[in-house]
Amino acid sequence: MATVEERVWTMGDYIEESPRVARENLARADELTAPLIACCDGGVPTRIRLVASGSSYNACQCALPFMESCLPDVQIRVVTPHRFAYYEPAVAAGELVAVVTQSGLSTNALEALDAIRAQDRRAICLTGNVASDAREHADVVVDWGVGVELVGYVTKGVTTLALFLMMFAAKLGAHEDRLGELSGAIDAADAVRAATYGFFERNEKALLSMAVSYCVAPFGARGVALEGALKIGETVHVPSPAYEVEEFIHGPNLQLTPGYTLFFFDAGDAAGERTRLVYRAAREVSDAAFLVTTDASFAGDPHVLVAPELPSWELASLAYLPFVQLVAHLASSALGSSKQHPLLKRFKAIAAAKTESFVNYDGDE
């Protein structure tokens, strides 16, 4: 039997694993969150800063609305390691700063940890790999419970990180009653995962013809829009920005043509009606405009994936994540588009994003 390292794993394998692992992690909420809660020294910080990049940054954004609702008196910010290290490294009294890196090998995250240590502050790292290089740069290493994920285009890690941060906020804010909402969101995400295959099949020609892709959402679904833009850009290799729904119609929409692909994410919050209106407007220009929503009135529309009703709008990004993950995976697999240009090897030799300990299992270089 092949070992984990010998088997060729795909994004799809980890997307399929995610609901099970998420449910297992929710059952382990006390165990998983205890180390980070211990870093709060018996109280609630006045400020929390999550320092993360790439998909980890997006996972933090997915968690942010729910975290803020559980910790209304805490200022919670998500910043990149670059911004932290170069522009705002000072750690204030009463502030919890946690640096996030799934691999534990991201050079910018390690630099941020070093910047914290240089102030004689406690360097806290959230990671999926406690045996990584990060342990040499951090004072506290917290495993958020992703397990093994060998594919570089991470999916299970995003889902489990968002869930971990939500569990942490619920526990820290004494809102354990809201853990049931997280269970409902996991169930909704599993339903979205299952429904995305049919959605992709219905819209296969359009989704295999992406030239420029926009992901558009209100604040309530900003995290999933950011992650969708990143995953499509990483794997399908087309320009793929993300916009807030109202910012989208103040300039970025002016370049639209029928050749553009657009994904709209309706969080089901107060901005939902506006989001759906802008989606309908986009369809006047492009037939490749799509919507993910919980609004049952769209049932039967082949361009819309109707998700189950959510326990709260703050969970929209977590529930919708499998949609963007699978669209990127199915499209890039069919197209064989994730292979990188050979000149990128020269780029990485000059400006590396990972330490020398990093092993690329994707075969995409």
Q: Locations of the language-model features?
A:
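Active-site phosphate/pyrophosphate-binding segments
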Residues: 7-45, 140-142, 148-261, 271, ...
